């Protein structure tokens, strides 16, 4: 299967082959996810994650689908030990979406994800200048796409939709994820 990059003219998605391990992960994820979260909740009292709102020249927003969880999300992930949140969002963008930030990410909002994951906090950044680069998220990312904010896929999570509106339109952010 040919892999198309988001820098190719007229291409709205980066797609890759759906391999059997990815399908297997999607089938067992609903059962294993609560166990993994419970383990990390007791092992680490506080977790910090980052997400990025990135738009292209047409005003489309970058979203992605993971192989292990259903829905469309803003790119991002966890902040690693010894890493700043700003460094983490730049790293996650490159790893997951093949996007290299050319400008310093701007912090838009901070949220608690206490209801779903006690002790979890998420920082949302806006990246305005970027270029494509090689992604190394094989096995983790199923699909990457660019969507107009008013035409997001049906499977886009409610929190993702709220963060996009807050970041793009300057609306007051909800402190809860």
Identify the residue ranges that each predicted region occupies.
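Nudix hydrolase/Nudix homology domain
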Residues: 2-16, 70-71, 138-177
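Acidic, metal-coordinating catalytic segment for phosphate/diphosphate chemistry
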Residues: 4, 10-51
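Structural detector for helix-capping/boundary residues
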Residues: 50, 77, 91-92, 147-150
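Conserved hydrophobic/aromatic beta-strand scaffold that supports enzyme active sites
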Residues: 53, 63, 124-126, 146
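Conserved Nudix-box catalytic region and its N-terminal flanking loop in Nudix hydrolases
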Residues: 56, 60-95
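A short coil-to-beta-strand element that immediately follows conserved catalytic motifs
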Residues: 100-109
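Active-site-adjacent beta-strand/loop module that shapes the phosphate/pyrophosphate-binding cleft
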Residues: 110-134, 160
């Amino acid at each position: 299967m040919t892999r198309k990059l988001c820098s190719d003219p007229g291409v709205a998605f980066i797609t890759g082959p759906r391999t059997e391990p990815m399908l297997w992960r999607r089938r067992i994820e609903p059962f294993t996810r609560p166990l993994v979260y419970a383990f990390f909740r007791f092992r680490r009292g506080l977790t910090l994650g980052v997400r990025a709102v990135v738009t292209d020249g047409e005003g489309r927003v970058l979203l992605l689908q993971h192989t292990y969880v259903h829905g469309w999300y803003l790119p991002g992930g966890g902040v690693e030990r010894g890493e700043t949140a700003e460094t983490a969002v730049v790293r996650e963008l490159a790893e997951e979406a093949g996007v290299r930030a050319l400008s310093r990410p701007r912090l838009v909002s901070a949220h608690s994800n206490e209801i779903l994951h006690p002790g979890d906090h998420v920082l949302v950044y806006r990246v305005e200048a970027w270029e494509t680069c090689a992604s190394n998220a094989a096995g983790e990312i199923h699909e990457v796409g660019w969507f107009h904010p008013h035409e997001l896929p049906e499977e886009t999570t409610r929190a993702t939709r709220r963060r996009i509106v807050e970041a793009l339109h300057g609306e007051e952010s909800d402190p809860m994820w």
